[in-house]
Amino acid sequence: MNLHEYQAKALFAEYGLPVSEGYACDTPQEAVEAAGHIGGDMWVVKCQVHAGGRGKAGGVKVTGDKEEIRAFAEHWLGKNLVTYQTDEKGQPVAKILVESCTDIANELYLGAVVDRATRRVVFMASTEGGVEIETVAEETPELIHKAIIDPLTGPQPYQARDLGFKLGLNPTQMKQFTKVFMGLATMFTDHDFALLEINPLVITTEGNIHCLDGKIGIDGNALFRQPKIRDMHDPSQDDAREAHAAKFELNYVALDGNVGCMVNGAGLAMGTMDIVNLHGGKPANFLDVGGGATKERVAEAFKIILSDANVKAVLVNIFGGIVRCDMIAEGIIGAVKEVGVEVPVVVRLEGTNADLGREVLANSGLDIIAAESLTDAAVKVVAAAEGK
């Protein structure tokens, strides 16, 4: 689950981190009033969506005219913002963040992730602020400095000082940076973050450290113990199909291909997508129906897959371990009849009672294409998607 920038900065403020005075506004009039409340003669207005690249897409504006703030809000509220991180439809703008303007002398980067390799929270800092960290990692990896947080001892001030020295901070900035580092590290574990970015973390013209942006991703598996964070969820930013899938405990991720994939098991699902790619196809989705591939869940999975108009064929790849393949086959048949599937469906069954499951499919009277192996299934579904 992701948070909006204004929500991230509200959390920063709770932990004593330096952020700009700002207000999230629902109407153009609120935006104008927010600028008046903030004071000053320059403001920054930002569309609030769960995507980067807002500035290049026109979703960020610096202005000293309150009527320009009104015009900006009137233009964007209720519309979708399309950036390089969204699909062609973009994401809806329901709030505009109005902030005081900050004079910038230098831009830095500070972020943290849960690193699977070290099984630790890892902080990353760089002098290359305002640039995508992936670009820095690819082109100049030596400019990324890391601090690994030991879960037993927690974050330590010396780790912040070590990063600060590498960033070239002066003694005053070092103290400020240490406070930011310690606050973020505490916040990361307190609220079960999966990702945290301040890009840019700036040094103002007055020489102070300031959090100019904020990006937070929450571990969805921990939301049951984070009621405050859970209430911050903005469902308008979710993909409609992914949100529908979550209601039925289906793991679905929309992609841009034309071969729908329905698989039980995340590893098998990824392998299925790989082999579809290998044989010239493009998966339209990742969909893991989990261990309990019941008729109801399979039916919902078909509905979700077929709600994508780009899907030209569906590959169902099921390994019967705990559940029997003949039961799964009956579920597939019932789901196909209920949903009224009109595109070719290729089914590969393996595991417990696989032969009986294939027999059930063959005797169903439905136009279901049986596959003997995963390779055979991939070849057949790619051909079906191409109309061959």
UniProtKB/Swiss-Prot annotation:
PROSITE patterns per the UniProt record, alphabetical: ATP_GRASP, SUCCINYL_COA_LIG_3
Domain of life: Bacteria
GO cellular component: cytosol; succinate-CoA ligase complex
Pathway entry: Carbohydrate metabolism; tricarboxylic acid cycle; succinate from succinyl-CoA (ligase route): step 1/1
Pfam families: ATP-grasp_2, Ligase_CoA
Catalyzed chemical reaction(s): succinate + ATP + CoA = succinyl-CoA + ADP + phosphate; GTP + succinate + CoA = succinyl-CoA + GDP + phosphate
Keyword ATP-binding applies: yes
Cofactor(s) needed by this chain: Mg(2+)
ATP-grasp domain ranges (all copies): 9-244
InterPro entries (alphabetical): ATP-grasp (IPR011761), ATP-grasp_succ-CoA_synth-type (IPR013650), ATP_grasp_subdomain_1 (IPR013815), Succ-CoA_synthase_bsu_CS (IPR017866), SUCC_ACL_C (IPR005811), Succ_CoA_ligase-like_bsu (IPR005809), Succinyl-CoA_synth-like (IPR016102)
Record key words, sorted: ATP-binding, Ligase, Magnesium, Metal-binding, Nucleotide-binding, Tricarboxylic acid cycle
UniProt: Mg(2+) binding residues: 199, 213
A GO MF label: ATP binding
Residues that bind substrate: 264, 321-323
Its EC number(s): 6.2.1.5
Disulfide cysteine pairs (residue numbers): none
Stored Gene3D superfamilies: ATP-grasp fold, A domain (3.30.1490.20), ATP-grasp fold, B domain (3.30.470.20), Succinyl-CoA synthetase domains (3.40.50.261)
Entries under SUPFAM superfamilies matching the protein: Glutathione synthetase ATP-binding domain-like, Succinyl-CoA synthetase domains
Binding site for ATP: 46, 53-55, 99, 102, 107
Keyword Metal-binding: yes
Similarity-based family: Belongs to the succinate/malate CoA ligase beta subunit family.
HAMAP family linked: Succ_CoA_beta (MF_00558)
Oligomeric and partner information: Heterotetramer of two alpha and two beta subunits.
Name by which UniProt lists this protein: Succinate--CoA ligase [ADP-forming] subunit beta
Gene name of the encoded protein: sucC
